[in-house]
Amino acid sequence: MARYVFITGGVVSSLGKGIAAAALAALLQARGYSVRLRKLDPYLNVDPGTMSPYQHGEVFVTDDGAETDLDLGHYERFTGRSANSQDNITTGRIYRNIIERERRGDYLGATVQVIPHVTDEIKRFITTGNEEFDFVLCEIGGTVGDIEAMPFLEAIRQLHNELPRQNVIYVHLTLMPYISSAGELKTKPTQHSVKELQSVGIAPDILLVRADRPIPETERSKLSLFCNVRPTAVIQALDMPTIYDVPIAYHKEGLDSEVLSAFGMHPAHKPNMDRWEDITHRIHHPEGEVTIAVVGKYTGLKDAYKSLTEAIAHGGLANKVKVNIEWIDAELFEREDPTSTLRKVHGILVPGAFGVRGAEGKMRAIQFARERRVPFFGICFGMQLACIEAARNIAQIENASSSEFCETKNPIVGLMTEWLKGDVLEKRTKCGNFGGTMRLGAFAAELKENSHIAQIYGMTRIYERHRHRYEVNIDYKDKLEQCGLVFSGMSPDGVLPETIEYADHPWFIGVQYHPELKSRPFDPHPLFSSFIEATVEQSRLV
């Protein structure tokens, strides 16, 4: 039977509960245990699919098409296990399920209430489908004390009594701030956070304390005394140079041993940390460095491109180089020539986005990469803009644009009005709902034999994750190919363009899907490995 670890956060948000959960899962895996990670988000949105990237950050898409929290990306990258739609739940989804059941009459006329109906639905989500796992780690979003998190805290409190003894523990992540005027770390915020948690009936078994400097033993003893946890269960979580340093750091602090001890488990074998030590060695001892420009729309918030940032780093690991990212707001190139900025970089990447803002600036960056033979990688929207740029500047198609931007006689990119979902043909219109209406999840693509991208993959049939509402218009394929743009990948039915490239360019590839979502530190995505390899070659020419 699975054992449950519930991870809560206190004092402030953005302490890194997702990284803490992923790191603990990696440590348990290194000891030979099977682990599942789940995220419970208290917001009322059904999913983050329609939320602004500036508010929520990246939307992480799973193989089965769920739009989920970006922490699931950390879970996948640290454990190598693919998440699915059942690994992330929101208050909105919980309430939607309950209302649907109430309308069907499933509650037999009962008054539907937060307790027991909402909490029962949360508990059902937490405990379903865990038979094959040794541990289930559940991260509770938000901060203790948030009113919207109360049903989740009540649900995990109840599970402590409903599951067998020693099958549930609580890890509380908190902050110990340093007050420079006093010259000391302060324990009081953590004490109050634990007090708030205890007020809802939850007593943490382990305190994971974030700090920017080592915590003195006297302060750890103080936390142990006032927060009612064992001295060894006060684990310091110091700031690390990279997130991939965290598992080793937590192991050295004894987090995994303390978790097993809390469950009454005393394994004889230490975890095998060899691959984590290899990764951190590569990160801190690169054999060179390159610089790439990411020309994007949401560059003001790096969390909007979290998986992309990590995938680029993985490409650097594969090539034993440090990759410096120069974040460029695409609107900059709508006001000025990109040459002075881009001539210094070794590669250009245009990531996914929605809407017309910054599109012209991105196309100027794409034109620069094409004409100057700089390695270029276009993802989703980046591929679509590469096709529009070719239509305008090579094929000389008048008013070439996207129907997402404006009405045009030559929509190189158009709205997907219908596609198969399972065996059902779904249709949507411009006035329909936006939530869950995109092409989402893993789909197959057929790559041309001997194309550059097929050589990179080492195969001609691939499965990649998609998240898009618009597609390159197949009606313009022949005209664009006559101008040298190769449609090197198509959907198996030959209807949807999936990849493009220029045969006479050192490295120019656009993909309709999101390869960054499947890249892992121990298994870098081949496209990112190849792209960074090309930038290394470019660095020798600049």
Curated annotation (Swiss-Prot):
* Annotated stretches, region: Amidoligase domain: 1-265
**For binding Mg(2+), which residues are annotated in this chain's numbering?**
D71, E139
Q: Name one GO molecular function term.
A: identical protein binding
The record, for CDD domains, names: CTPS_N (cd03113), GATase1_CTP_Synthase (cd01746)
**Active site, per annotation:** C380, H514, E516
| Annotated L-glutamine binding sites | Y54, A353, F381, G382, M383, Q384, E404, R469
Q: Which UniProt keywords apply?
A: ATP-binding, Glutamine amidotransferase, Ligase, Magnesium, Metal-binding, Nucleotide-binding, Pyrimidine biosynthesis
**Can you supply one Gene Ontology CC term for this chain's record?**
cytosol
The regulatory note on its activity is: Allosterically activated by GTP, when glutamine is the substrate; GTP has no effect on the reaction when ammonia is the substrate. The allosteric effector GTP functions by stabilizing the protein conformation that binds the tetrahedral intermediate(s) formed during glutamine hydrolysis. Inhibited by the product CTP, via allosteric rather than competitive inhibition.
State if Ligase is listed as a keyword: yes
What is stated as this protein's family in its record?
A: Belongs to the CTP synthase family.
Q: Which NCBIfam families does the record associate with it?
A: PRK05380.1, PyrG
Name assigned to this protein: CTP synthase
Q: Which organism is it from?
A: Bartonella henselae (strain ATCC 49882 / DSM 28221 / CCUG 30454 / Houston 1) (Rochalimaea henselae)
**What's the gene?**
pyrG
